[in-house]
């Protein structure tokens, strides 16, 4: 739905459990949460079953644009992606990308989302390949993006205004908003992958970082 629905689900579940407690004897212990919902926590079940919205953003970038603007060859980024995939496997993380939480957190704060949900929302699968023309195809899939365009913090003045700027406030807007968030993440992934692959990452931080 357009609301994240977490509070609604909690209330409905609590009411249903209350009915069970009233009608069945012998229940010794009852807890509304047992951690299987993995609220505010990254988990494999969210990647497989989805909690929130599952969304994919993809792009094909011309080789000449990468060389001119990002100063990197598509082959460098593609190979870097394979190396990063091995690193992700060895470290046991739930993300084969580089820094999806940065873009997601920025969007969440600006638009009144529950920032604590960045934990499960930032899981991502990054994929790239070279096209027959030597261009770069990239995609990112976010399996559990918990977003809303109505309810909760989305109604706060500035946050609602940001959603309205994106034409994403209110009913029937949440899937559009999810696509925008995924696009922001993909743009950040391409930028950082290019910076690392071209060895501009550290020098850029030194020149433009917060301590300057």
Short names for language-model regions:
Residues 2-155:
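Glycine-rich anion/phosphate-binding loop at the beta-strand->alpha-helix junction
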């Amino acid at each position: 739905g357009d609301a994240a629905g977490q509070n609604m689900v909690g209330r409905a579940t609590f009411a249903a459990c209350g009915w069970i407690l009233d009608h069945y004897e012998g229940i010794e212990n009852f807890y509304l949460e047992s951690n299987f919902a993995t609220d505010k926590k990254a988990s494999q079940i969210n990647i497989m079953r989805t909690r929130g919205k599952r969304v994919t953003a993809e792009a094909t970038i011309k080789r000449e644009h990468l060389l001119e603007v990002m100063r990197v060859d598509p082959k460098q980024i593609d190979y870097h992606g394979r190396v990063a995939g091995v690193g992700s496997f060895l470290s046991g993380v739930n993300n084969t990308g580089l820094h999806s939480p940065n873009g997601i957190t920025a969007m969440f704060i600006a638009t009144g989302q529950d920032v604590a949900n960045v934990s499960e929302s930032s899981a991502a699968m990054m994929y790239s390949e070279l096209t027959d023309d030597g261009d770069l195809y990239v995609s990112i899939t976010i399996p559990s993006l918990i977003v809303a365009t109505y309810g909760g913090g989305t109604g706060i003045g500035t946050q609602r205004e940001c959603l309205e700027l994106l034409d994403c406030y209110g009913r029937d807007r949440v899937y559009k908003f999810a696509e925008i968030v995924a696009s922001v993440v993909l743009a950040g992934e391409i930028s950082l992958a290019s910076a690392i692959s071209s060895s501009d990452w550290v020098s850029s931080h030194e020149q433009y970082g917060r301590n300057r």
